[in-house]
Regions:
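Contiguous segments within soluble domain cores/interaction surfaces
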Residues: 625-670
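Short coil/turn segments that connect the beta-strands within blades of beta-propeller domains
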Residues: 35-37, 78-80, 119-120, 160-162, ...
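Periplasmic c-type cytochrome electron-transfer domains
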Residues: 154-158, 170, 177-182, 196-232, ...
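Beta-strand-rich domains and repeat architectures in extracellular enzymes and scaffolds
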Residues: 23-48, 259-262
């Protein structure tokens, strides 16, 4: 009986896994189907996706409205569906390309970005949930969530190996998920100060990966504009899973100074095209010689690239121009720029957003080097502490900044227009106004900058438009108790951090700051606590790595609220409340209607925490299934001696000597997830190799009736002796 099951499972595995990875394996703001010659472009500020036919020329066919703010897109050419991640709504939106209309959506984690799919699953990177969602491709049922390190952003799926590469936005590191085991199996450490890491390009011939990144030189205490950040393409060795430092491509050397390299794509001639979103150009690099071949000017804020091997063209998504640039990959010339969307934004606000993201104008930056977005990408922070003339300064998020005057940690900016000082000093631009910066001897002691130039007014208008995403209004019992503590006289937190902005707009000496480094003294503006769960490190100098450290080891004198005498439970409750402040909600805002299933289909997925075990180690086994119909569900284990047993219950993992279903008549349309084993192995567990099988069978049919199999999965693991 064991051999019969094993042979049938193995044969079906060989057939099914041969066809995994048929869909687009990389996502970004552009996606191209080689099969149908359809090009899809994400328009974040138009809240839409544009659909083009590009086989003969380039023709806009439709523009599909997307709830929330669309981020990235992937095309499934087999089903003629496109998958779009949407921020704010926190959903995966599904477009039916037969009708160029929305087919439905799936709720995912917070701030989703990257999305890719294979023949069985759709994968979504949830940046502010620190996770990857796995969704059954045919039924659109969320199957499981894989926890990863902080701020996962981009995804790249290698269909050959079944490995999913995950970029981490603030560290530049890459996590590797084995999609057959649904586990993070490795992490490639870039060993640098890499930042703004979104895209990853696979080079199978050289067994390499390339990541456009911005390196931060935040340890330098004598910053100049061109020693602050560096535009870089990092090279990874995929065999050794290490960074190849000697093979880094410094774009300011191999090409010319550029700002914020963000996306990249390879053509058929082993040339790498890099979209530089701040300097509004594309760098072209010969990977064989590591030499720059061209620098091509495109539209405003290019954030996405796609290569068409049939026509040998590169498409560029200029998100703040609302256009597509077309590059001839043979001549390395921009041949045309076509309208993608009409951005429905008032001209002053749109101009302000362009200025914020731009380093190409000499008024804004010297030599294309730094934009406002370099440290405040999408208006947020960079997890860095910089040594400025005033002293060490932790980069704050700008979300909600208009509601929290004065500005700067020293509180010496009394209007948003005083950003003119940063444009001239930090970015080394000539400035958006003529004459003085109106910041001598200090910005709050000089004439106002408002009204001095249209560009500066527009930039301030854009800064004022930056707002937090909708807050998570539901609180746990612990968070509610923490709110009471926060507001009580016991802690005194709310005396300075006054709702709704959670600041009093005043400066205080809270015992931080080294006198020799602080040119403007040790009085610091009270920061807002909104969104504090995503803005580590903390304090003006970034000296507190976490909230736990801030309110314990660094608050012995109770200058950040009276916390020294809190019980462990009270301390946990207070942190729960702080972590809940403006926390991005998971799942779509409002009703999210799941798309209709593509076909009668089902899946089964076994997830084991590792493959080799010894007594005393933790073993965790779970099973997940989804589909469009009901099924009887079996989980069978083959012991090292050949004995076959079945899990007879989904509740207590009882093993039966008979091949009975673990669950009868399960509605897979609702999804099915069970943790079967979660234990520490003791020494009397037999050593040897174990085989696990999960099989979904048509209701009422026998396990060994192969024609009745709807889905299956197989895992092998070994328990070694303690010797």
């Amino acid at each position: 009986m064991f051999l019969g099951v094993s042979v049938r499972v193995s044969l079906m595995l060989a057939v099914l896994f041969l066809h995994r990875g048929v869909a687009l394996a990389q996502s970004g703001s552009l996606a191209l189907s080689d099969v149908t010659a359809e090009l899809l472009a994400v328009n974040p500020d138009s809240h839409s996706v544009s659909v083009f036919d590009v086989r003969s020329g380039i023709r806009k066919r439709a523009e599909v409205s997307i709830p929330g703010i669309p981020q990235a897109i992937s095309i499934d050419s087999v089903s003629r569906k496109a998958f779009v991640t949407s921020r704010q709504s926190n959903t995966l939106e599904v477009i039916a390309l037969e009708s160029d209309s929305l087919a439905g959506c799936v709720a995912v984690g917070a701030s989703p970005f990257g999305v890719v799919s294979d023949a069985k699953y759709i994968y979504v990177a949830n940046q502010k949930s620190d996770s990857v969602s796995v969704i059954h491709r045919s039924s659109f049922i969320p199957l499981l969530t894989i926890d990863v390190d902080s701020d996962p952003r981009g995804l790249r799926l290698d269909a050959q190996s079944g490995l999913l590469y995950v970029t981490h936005f603030f560290t530049g590191d890459v996590s590797i998920i084995d999609t057959q085991r649904m586990l993070v199996t490795d992490r490639i450490n870039v060993n640098s100060s890499a930042n703004i890491s979104q895209s990853l390009v696979l080079d199978h011939d050289r067994h390499r990966a390339y990541l456009p990144q911005t390196f931060s030189n935040s340890a330098n205490q004598s910053l100049l504009f061109d020693t602050t950040v560096f535009p870089m393409v990092t090279s990874l060795d995929l065999l050794t899973r290490t960074e190849m430092r000697a093979s880094r491509l410094a774009l300011d050397v191999v090409d010319q100074p550029v700002g914020i390299p963000l996306d990249a794509v390879m053509d058929s001639s082993d040339r790498l095209f890099v979209a530089n979103s701040a300097s509004n150009d594309v760098s072209v690099i010969d990977l064989a010689t590591s030499r720059g071949l061209a620098n091509l000017e495109v539209g405003a804020n290019p954030r996405g690239l796609a290569f068409d091997p049939v026509s040998n063209r590169i498409f560029v998504n200029n998100t703040l121009s609302g256009t597509l640039s077309v590059i001839d990959a043979e001549t390395l010339k921009v041949t045309e720029e076509v309208q993608n969307t009409d951005i429905p934004m008032a001209q002053p606000l749109l101009n302000g957003k362009r200025i914020f993201n731009d380093s190409s104008r000499p008024e804004l930056a010297k030599d294309n080097w730094i934009a406002c977005a370099t440290c405040h990408f999408d208006g947020e922070h960079d997890e860095r502490t910089w040594f400025f003339a005033d002293g060490p300064r932790n980069t704050p998020s700008l979300l909600g900044v208009a509601d929290t005057p004065p500005f700067h940690w020293s509180g010496d900016l009394d209007e948003l227009h005083d950003v003119e000082l940063a444009v001239r000093v930090t970015q080394a631009g000539t400035g958006l106004t003529s004459g003085s910066s109106n910041c001598e001897p200090a910005c709050d002691q000089a004439p106002a900058n408002r009204g001095r130039s249209q560009d500066l007014d527009d930039l301030a208008l854009y800064l004022a438009s930056l707002q937090f995403e909708p807050a998570n209004t539901s609180m746990s019992a612990s968070a509610l108790q923490g709110q009471r503590l926060f507001s009580s006289e016991t802690t005194g937190c709310a005396q300075c951090h006054i709702p709704p902005a959670y600041t009093d707009g005043l400066r205080h000496d809270v015992g931080t700051g080294t006198g020799s480094l602080e040119r403007k003294g040790t009085l610091f503006d009270t920061p807002s606590l909104l969104g504090i769960n995503r803005t580590a490190p903390y304090l003006h100098d970034g000296s507190a790595a976490s909230l736990e450290i801030l309110f314990s080891a660094m608050n012995a004198s109770d200058l950040h609220g009276v916390t020294a005498n809190l019980t462990a439970t009270e301390f946990t409750d207070l942190l729960a409340f702080l972590n809940n402040l403006a926390a991005a909600p998971e799942g779509g805002a409002g009703v999210c209607e799941k798309p209709a299933a593509l076909k009668a289909d089902a899946n089964a997925e076994l997830v084991l925490n590792q493959q080799d075990f010894r007594p005393g180690e933790h073993l965790s086994l779970s099973v997940h299934s989804a589909g469009s119909q009901s099924a009887d569900f079996y989980v069978v284990i083959a012991l090292p001696d050949g004995t076959l047993a079945a899990f007879a219950s989904s509740e207590n993992a009882l093993l039966s000597g008979e091949l009975v279903p673990m669950a009868d008549n399960v509605d897979l349309g609702k999804g099915f997830s069970v943790r079967l084993v979660d234990t520490v192995l003791d020494s009397n567990v037999p050593a040897g190799v174990y085989q696990l099988y999960a099989v979904a069978v048509s209701v009422g049919e026998e396990l060994l009736s192969q024609d009745a199999w709807l889905a299956f999965d197989q895992l092998e693991f070994e328990i070694r002796s303690s010797d």
